[in-house]
């Protein structure tokens, strides 16, 4: 299973993302004899083998269905098991674009965490690029390393168990095909740490000396940003800027087109039927005058009278908009127009992104001093 390639047919041992809904995606490894149990039904792994990625799979008893999706970094981000707070696609895509991460880029990442951004970096830099990622928490390091191995990403990724704030970024046993100028020689740096300002002074020995290097620090609090900016200035980084990405989803809908003439005509029709009803009641009272019943009959009728029946509004009279009826969006009997609106629940602040750049001449001058 590899995030670098795509395949059509699902085989045993493959990673499949079971799409139950926009906010409910379950990652499963296809294993013979296993079964995925959901509120939408039961789905046997044996039946998944041989199916195509993207295909809709019905439940075991014909109840419910799921879609079997091929894993991508973006889908993995919204379905992975959380070990830490993660970097979501609105932030990660902006960081990759702004730092100009492309095929062949050498990336240094501190704070592997749940591995969300590691997957995006590894996919973007391709087989020619190199990712050096660090995690200080050993259990998280072990789990992240296994995930990267299972997903075929260790071909361009080295994960290291290290506290980079105290011990730096140097790696003594770098594989030969990962070396450049006998070292890491990073082009881009991403720090997702509680105190990135303590790790910034350790970067100069592992970043490129031949090209401009970009850095992004991911910090939830503005106090962290202040300390990070001071450390960047002290170490000679320039073009420092802090941004915040606010992602909003625009939802497409169809809105029924209502003509003013039809509205006026419907109001007149309602008033006309109302007047007819009033007149009908008046006539009924006139015809019932003189009818006399025994008091006992009246009392008996009152006691045994059933509860009034509630009738559904069936849209009687002139009804050009289907009022009182179940009208499906896009129904061809009515006229529609395409509209958009912002999602009802907008995600709030995630983190501040602090960007800066180091030019080769600044780095060389600092080294000479």
UniProtKB/Swiss-Prot annotation:
**Amino-acid positions noted as binding S-adenosyl-L-methionine in the UniProt annotation, renumbered to this chain:** 114-116, 135, 140, 163-164, 192
- Keyword set, alphabetical order: Methyltransferase, Nucleus, S-adenosyl-L-methionine, Transferase, tRNA processing
Localisation: Nucleus
Q: For this protein, what is the EC number?
A: 2.1.1.220
- One Gene Ontology cellular component: tRNA (m1A) methyltransferase complex
Concerning InterPro entries, the annotation shows: SAM-dependent_MTases_sf, TRM61_C, tRNA_MeTrfase_Gcd14
Q: Which domain of life is it from?
A: Eukaryota
Q: Which Pfam families match?
A: GCD14
Q: What is its main location?
A: nucleus
Catalyzes what?
Answer: adenosine(58) in tRNA + S-adenosyl-L-methionine = N(1)-methyladenosine(58) in tRNA + S-adenosyl-L-homocysteine + H(+)
Q: What are the annotated disulfide bridges?
A: none
Which GO molecular function entries does the Swiss-Prot or TrEMBL record give? Answer: tRNA (adenine(58)-N1)-methyltransferase activity
The first-level EC class reads: transferase
- Assembly and partners? Heterotetramer; composed of two copies of TRM6 and two copies of TRM61.
Query: Cross-referenced PANTHER family, in alphabetical order?
Result: TRNA (ADENINE(58)-N(1))-METHYLTRANSFERASE (PTHR12133), TRNA (ADENINE(58)-N(1))-METHYLTRANSFERASE CATALYTIC SUBUNIT TRMT61A (PTHR12133:SF2)
Family listed:
Belongs to the class I-like SAM-binding methyltransferase superfamily. TRM61 family.
**Entry protein name:** tRNA (adenine(58)-N(1))-methyltransferase catalytic subunit TRM61
Name the species this protein comes from.
Debaryomyces hansenii (strain ATCC 36239 / CBS 767 / BCRC 21394 / JCM 1990 / NBRC 0083 / IGC 2968) (Yeast)
């Amino acid at each position: 299973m590899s995030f670098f390639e795509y395949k059509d047919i699902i085989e045993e041992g493959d990673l499949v993302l079971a799409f139950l809904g926009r906010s409910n995606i379950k990652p499963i490894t296809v294993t013979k004899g296993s079964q995925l149990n959901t509120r939408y039904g039961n789905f046997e792994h044996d039946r998944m083998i041989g199916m195509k990625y993207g295909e809709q799979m019905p439940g075991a008893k014909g109840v419910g269905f799921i879609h079997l999706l091929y894993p991508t970094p973006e889908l993995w981000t919204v379905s992975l098991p959380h070990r830490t707070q993660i970097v979501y696609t609105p932030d990660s895509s902006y960081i990759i674009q702004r730092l100009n991460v492309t095929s062949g880029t050498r990336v240094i990442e501190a704070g592997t965490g749940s591995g969300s951004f590691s997957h995006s970096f590894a996919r973007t830099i391709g087989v020619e690029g190199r990712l050096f990622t660090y995690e200080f928490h050993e259990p998280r390091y072990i789990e992240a390393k296994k995930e990267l191995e299972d997903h075929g990403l260790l071909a361009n990724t080295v994960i290291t168990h290290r506290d980079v704030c105290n011990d730096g970024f140097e790696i003594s046993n770098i594989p030969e095909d990962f070396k450049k100028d006998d070292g890491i020689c990073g082009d881009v740096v991403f720090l997702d740490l509680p105190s990135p300002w303590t790790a910034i002074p350790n970067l100069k020995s592992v970043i490129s000396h031949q090209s401009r290097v970009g850095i992004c620090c991911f910090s939830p609090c503005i106090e962290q940003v202040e300390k990070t900016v001071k450390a960047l200035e002290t170490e000679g980084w320039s073009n420092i800027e802090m941004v915040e990405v606010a992602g909003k989803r625009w939802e497409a809908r169809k809105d029924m087109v209502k003509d003013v003439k039809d509205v006026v005509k419907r109001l007149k029709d309602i008033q006309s039927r109302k007047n007819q009803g009033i007149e009908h009641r008046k006539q009924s009272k006139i015809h019932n005058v003189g009818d006399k019943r025994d008091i006992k009959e009246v009392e008996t009728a009152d006691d045994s009278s059933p509860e009034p029946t509630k009738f559904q509004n069936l849209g009687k009279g002139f009804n050009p908009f289907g009022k009182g009826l179940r009208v499906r969006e896009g129904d061809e009997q009515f006229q529609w127009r395409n509209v958009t609106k912002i999602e009802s629940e907008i995600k709030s602040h995630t983190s501040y992104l602090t960007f800066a750049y180091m030019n080769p001449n600044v780095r060389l001058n600092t080294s000479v001093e």
